[in-house]
Regions:
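Glycine-rich phosphate/diphosphate-binding loop of Rossmann-like nucleotide-binding domains
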Residues: 51-63, 147-220
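Positively charged, low-complexity intrinsically disordered leader regions
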Residues: 1-59, 63
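Phosphate-coordination loops involved in phosphoryl transfer and adenosine-cofactor binding
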Residues: 41-46, 153-157, 255
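Adenosine-phosphate binding glycine-rich loop
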Residues: 255-256, 261-306
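Rossmann-like adenosine-cofactor binding region
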Residues: 196-273
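Short, structured coil segments at secondary-structure junctions
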Residues: 68, 119-121, 179, 197-200, ...
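Phosphate/diphosphate ligand-binding glycine-rich loop within oxidoreductases
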Residues: 35-143, 266
Length: 306
């Protein structure tokens, strides 16, 4: 199947996801080697166009591009013509005319990558759009899970935290359910959007129910900057009822994985002792991010392989 863009995981097949993850395993060998340089993207140009702040996602895309010998450039909206009023489409068309092969975009508006993709010849990768999707984060999460669990079919993944504002949660639900995993969400009712169960996941009444016999326990950051009003009484009350603590983690399987997309609010959605425990693969998620993004860029520039 040929695919010009990766705008989300909604509608992406199991075969496509498996192909990306298999390719990422090969790219991980490059990331772990002493010579992090290949010629896979030699002659290609990659631009990261970020309208929101980012550390992990932007840096991993930039490193992925450079490890494969692409010409890589970063555009910050605040330091470009966007600050002068240039539209997203005009910016995209300008980059297109400069011969850009892939545009990686992060934008506060849901659907912005889809809009951009309709107006440019370059491949467009969604690096996070509003509260919609963050497909590469879900792919790196699945790569990390698959490496430790041996597969995703039948795995129970508990996702705990600010589901309402989380594009990571949505992409993980799409991807994990496609791969046959069982996704369980838990959060205060005010942080669970309506009709989430229609996406193929279940909603647990308590974090204890979500963690029970789970293969993976994933925390989500409480995104206070996206909240228009207080959706829970206080941080202290949130912690009392919903924080991932050692006691709650103990309800999961003995070797259950602890995950978090970052950045973390330690002592809010996840206890520091849990984030740093032997079951935590949070730092490995970062490594997986570079490998997944290398794989995706490689495959998008050779569309017959996607």
């Amino acid at each position: 199947m040929k695919r010009k863009d990766l705008l989300g995981l909604d509608g992406v097949s199991r075969e496509e996801i498996t192909s990306i993850l298999d390719t990422a395993l090969m790219m991980r060998q490059v990331v772990r080697s002493n010579n992090k340089k290949t010629t896979h993207l030699q002659g290609k140009s990659i631009v990261t166009l970020f309208y929101e702040n980012s550390t992990r996602t932007r840096m991993s895309f930039e490193l992925a591009s450079k490890y494969m010998s692409a010409a890589a450039a970063n555009i910050s909206a605040s330091a470009s013509s966007v600050a002068k009023g240039e539209t997203l489409i005009d910016t995209g068309v300008t980059l297109d005319q400069m011969g850009t092969d892939v545009i990686i975009i992060r934008h506060p508006m849901s659907g912005a990558p889809t809009l951009l993709a309709k107006h440019v010849k370059a491949s467009v990768v969604n690096a996070g759009d509003g509260m919609n999707e963050h497909p590469t984060q879900a792919l790196l999460d699945m790569l990390t899970m698959r490496e430790h669990l041996g597969g995703l079919e039948g795995a129970k993944v508990a996702i705990c935290g600010d589901v309402m504002h989380s594009r990571v949660a949505r992409s993980n639900i799409y991807g994990l359910t496609t791969m046959g995993a069982k996704v369980v969400l838990c959060a205060p009712p005010t942080l669970i959007p309506p009709r989430m169960d229609e996406m193929g996941c279940t909603i647990a009444p308590t974090i204890e129910d979500a963690c029970e016999n789970a293969d993976v326990v994933m925390g989500l950051r409480i995104q206070r900057e996206r909240q228009q009003k207080g959706l829970f009484p206080s941080v202290a009350e949130y912690c009392d009822h919903w924080e991932i603590t050692p006691q709650r983690l103990a309800l999961a399987k003995k070797n259950a994985l602890v995950m978090h997309p970052g950045p973390m609010n330690r002592g809010v959605e996840i206890a520091s002792s849990v984030a740093d425990c032997g079951q935590s693969v949070i730092t490995q998620q970062v490594e997986s991010g570079v490998a997944v993004r290398m794989a995706l860029l490689y495959m998008l520039t050779r569309r017959e392989n996607v």
